A protein has these predicted regions:
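Bacterial N-terminal signal peptides that target proteins for export
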Residues: 1-3
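C-terminal motif of bacterial Sec signal peptides marking the signal peptidase cleavage site
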Residues: 12-15
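Mature extracytoplasmic enzyme cores
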Residues: 20, 25-34, 42, 57-68, ...
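Acidic-and-aromatic substrate-binding clefts and catalytic sites of carbohydrate-active enzymes
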Residues: 48-57, 79-92, 320-324
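Second-shell loop/turn segments in exported
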Residues: 48-51, 83-86, 200-205, 290-292
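Hydrophobic residues within beta-strands of alpha/beta enzymes
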Residues: 73-75, 236
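Aromatic-lined carbohydrate-recognition surfaces of secreted/lumenal glycan-active proteins
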Residues: 108-116, 232-240, 292-324
């Protein structure tokens, strides 16, 4: 049941501090480091926790890592876990692993999620904060030459007038049964799954979601191992946080407001330019992508940066690639 992830994470010394000894650039010092590297120069594999986690299994895995010449480990919750994630038992076992690792000269890194992608805290974020997932995350386009009889399911309706589009969402009665080029946008939602604790993944662009995630995820670690933050608990690994669309254009509730504030014009009547190469589509697409990126930086990366700086923790991991 217990496995070590195939990919080994090699850690360098860039930005590392805490309990690590200062090095010099003398040849003799470097030669000694190559002969017997300190922990920050050694590999640190995933220490996968699944099934029933016990102190005996922790001892075995840490011994295997030490015998293999590793410098630390990332404790990684994975599918199949019986021990409840973020329970009192979970944190007690984590404390045991930290103490055992320190005794053996192995750094322990926190993995910030129950599997991946980071952000939902094993289902606790959507459970505590419904607005993190239930407002829609995408806009799916349907084009038609005649408005349907029922339009309630559409969030935005545009009509092409010459080389521009007019937002007629609140004036549909004037256009019923009138032929034209209509662009109908419907909200799409991230799908619910057992993987996310019966909920869905969350919208990391919604204000407060990352702060809720950090609070729910880290408060248990703060209670049990904070005294080792920046010491034997070296940092945090994040895994594939992302802002992918569940269908259509990526959207979030205050996208249009943030876009206008940043670029000085309204994105809504220009949504077709995100799909069609017409008009000033290159500028609009650039500004749209830049807005999403900046929202991700401001609402995901910066809260984590502040937390890690405040708590003397390093930050590593990898983001999910986007097909933009």
């Amino acid at each position: 049941i217990y496995t070590v992830a195939g990919g080994i994470l090699s850690l360098g010394t860039t930005g590392c501090s805490g309990n690590k000894a200062e090095t010099t650039d003398s040849f003799s010092t470097l030669e000694a480091q190559f002969s017997n590297p300190s922990s920050e120069y050694r590999t640190a594999p995933f220490m996968v926790w699944n099934g029933k986690v016990t102190e005996i299994e922790i001892d075995r895995m840490l011994k295997d890592f030490k015998d293999a010449g590793c410098g630390g480990a990332f404790i990684h919750p994975r599918p199949g876990m019986i021990t409840e994630y973020m329970s009192d038992e979970w944190y007690s076992l984590y404390r045991y692993a930290v103490d055992k690792g320190k005794e053996m000269g192995l750094d322990i890194w926190i993995y910030d999620e129950n599997s991946y992608p980071s952000g939902f805290a094993g289902g606790h974020v959507p459970e505590d904060m419904p607005e993190s997932y239930n407002q829609g995350q995408g806009l799916e386009l349907t084009k038609t030459d005649l408005l349907p009889d029922k339009t309630d399911e559409y969030f935005i309706i545009l009509k092409k007038e010459g080389d521009k589009w007019a937002d007629i969402t609140n004036a549909l009665s004037q256009h019923k049964k009138a032929k034209g080029e209509y662009y109908l946008y419907k909200k799409t939602y991230l799908g619910k799954s057992d993987w996310y604790g019966g909920y869905s993944y969350v919208d990391l662009l919604v204000p407060g979601v990352t702060e809720k995630f950090i609070d729910l995820t880290m408060k248990g670690y703060e209670k049990t191992i904070k005294d080792e933050f920046g010491k034997s608990v070296f940092g945090i690994f994040t895994d594939e946080p992302n802002i992918s669309s569940p269908g259509g254009l990526r959207w979030t509730p205050d996208l249009f407001e943030v876009f206008r504030k940043q670029w000085g014009y309204d994105l809504k009547p220009l949504l077709p330019l995100l799909d069609e190469e017409t008009g000033n589509w290159k500028q609009v697409r650039h500004n749209y992508m830049e807005t999403l990126l900046q929202m991700f930086v401001d609402r995901w990366s910066k809260p984590w940066h502040h937390y890690c700086e405040t708590n003397n923790l390093k930050w590593t991991g990898h983001y999910w690639e986007h097909g933009w």
